[in-house]
Each structure stands twice: as structure tokens, then as C-alpha cells.
Amino acid sequence: MDYYSEIKQELINNEVYKKVKDYSKNKSDLTTYYNVGKLLVEAQGGEERAKYGEGIIREYSKKLMMELDKKYSYRNLMSMRKYYLIFRNEKVHAMRS
């Protein structure tokens, strides 16, 4: 038995697994950001520059930070909204499934 080869293969398999896992997580995050951004734009009446909509996002942010996690700040929700606006006409939305 070639122990070195066995050990090396185990380590390679682990690295491949981690990369696949990271890709899946990243894809899931991007899909979530796209979908949240879309919902935020829809909540603002579909307007790209809805002034009153900033209040909606601030309100949602406060609630989400209290109920879920601090990472859902106004700034992060605005970034998700911008992400959607940038990619809404691209094939990125095909990732939603």
C-alpha cells in the first residue's frame, strides 16, 4: 500500500469538496441577494429611484437586524437592491432555481 498516495488523494478530495461546497454557498448567496433585491424594488413600486422606498428599506433593515442578524443593515439591503438592478436583464436570474 502506498500510504503517501492515499494521504495525498484524501487531501485532494477534501480540497475539491471544499471548493464545490464554497461554490454552492456562493451561488446560494448570490441567488438570495438577487431575489431580495428584486423584492425590495417591487416593494418600492418597481422604481429604480424611489425616494419613499428608502424608508421601506430602512424599516425592513431595522426589523431584520432585530429578528435575524445584524448583517441585514440598510447598507447591505441597498447593495442587494443594486445587485438586482445591475443584473436584472442578464441571464443571472436563471440561477434562481
Where do the protein language model's features map onto the residues?
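Basic, low-complexity intrinsically disordered segments
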Residues: 1-97
